[in-house]
């Protein structure tokens, strides 16, 4: 009896240890990674204040998560642990491997897509649902939620930022090209029938690493297919921006990507 209790206790301890949140931190920031491989929050530490970036905790919106749309709606795959701070998931023969890594002093993700199937992978779109809590539904909670303010796909790289109503700014950058970006809205409601009010609150910001053509000319035009045995790699970093006016300079210093700053666009 005692031996059985000892075995059960050991198993329960192992399960609780596996389910614990992983704390990943450096001097200027701290990330909490859930047992499911998604982020719970990022805290950027400053001398005057800390900026906390919240992430969704519910299964439908938490992230980063690998997803693909093959023509019949989005499919999202669960992460399987695959090493320290590393996870993998598979959709339609394509494996996505995500590893949390420090990059240029910033919290970042290395994302690898590899086609292990027998046919070319040609999704409507596929990539990451970032999982940043963008849902603004009530006062005063929305002051701490990050709204996708600017996202820009270039042929050689990607950059953008999210901003809270209270003025905090979070930059997102990749030195590799990203096909497109998109957002998911809440479902909406009928009130009264038959009138349907479409949802307008953002439930997810997505980085579409791949997207079917056509795309705007400024977007990369070769990320619509992943051939058998082919793999592509992206680094995606989160960057704390001191003020919105320092966005271009900060992103350029961190990632080395070309940026244009236009303090004024109209002269009278």
Regions found by a protein language model. Name each.
Residues 19-110, 114-188, 224, 228-230, ...:
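Beta-strand-rich N-terminal accessory domains
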Residues 243-268:
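Extracellular ectodomain segments of secreted/surface proteins
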Residues 238-242:
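Short, charged beta-turn/beta-strand-edge "cap" motif at the junction between a beta-strand
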Residues 4, 124-126, 248-254:
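Composition- and surface-driven signal marking solvent-exposed, interaction-prone regions
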Residues 1-21:
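Bacterial Sec-dependent N-terminal signal peptides
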Residues 209-218:
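Short beta-strand and strand-turn-strand segments in soluble, beta-rich domains
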């Amino acid at each position: 009896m005692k031996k059985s209790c000892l075995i059960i206790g050991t198993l329960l301890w192992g399960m609780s240890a596996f389910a614990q949140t992983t704390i990943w931190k450096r001097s200027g920031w701290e990330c909490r990674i859930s047992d499911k491989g998604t982020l719970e929050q990022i805290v950027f530490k400053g001398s005057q204040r800390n900026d906390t970036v919240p992430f969704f905790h519910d299964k439908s919106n938490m992230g980063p998560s690998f997803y693909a749309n093959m023509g019949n709606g989005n499919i999202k795959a669960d992460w399987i642990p695959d090493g320290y701070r590393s996870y993998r998931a598979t959709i339609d023969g394509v494996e996505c491997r995500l590893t949390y890594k420090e990059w240029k002093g910033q919290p970042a993700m290395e994302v690898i897509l590899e086609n292990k199937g027998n046919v070319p992978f040609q999704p409507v779109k596929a990539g990451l649902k970032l999982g940043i809590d963008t849902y603004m539904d009530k006062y005063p909670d929305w002051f701490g939620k990050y709204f996708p303010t600017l996202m820009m796909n270039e042929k050689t790289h990607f950059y953008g930022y999210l901003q809270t109503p209270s003025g905090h700014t979070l930059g997102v950058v990749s030195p590799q090209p990203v096909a497109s970006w998109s957002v998911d809205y809440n479902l909406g409601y009928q009130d009264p029938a038959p009138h349907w009010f479409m949802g307008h609150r953002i439930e997810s910001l997505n980085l579409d690493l791949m997207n079917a053509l056509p795309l705007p000319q400024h977007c990369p035009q070769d990320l619509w297919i992943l051939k058998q045995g082919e793999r592509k790699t992206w680094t995606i970093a989160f960057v704390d921006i001191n003020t919105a006016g320092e966005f271009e300079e900060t992103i350029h210093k961190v990632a080395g990507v070309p940026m244009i700053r236009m303090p004024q666009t109209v002269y009278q």
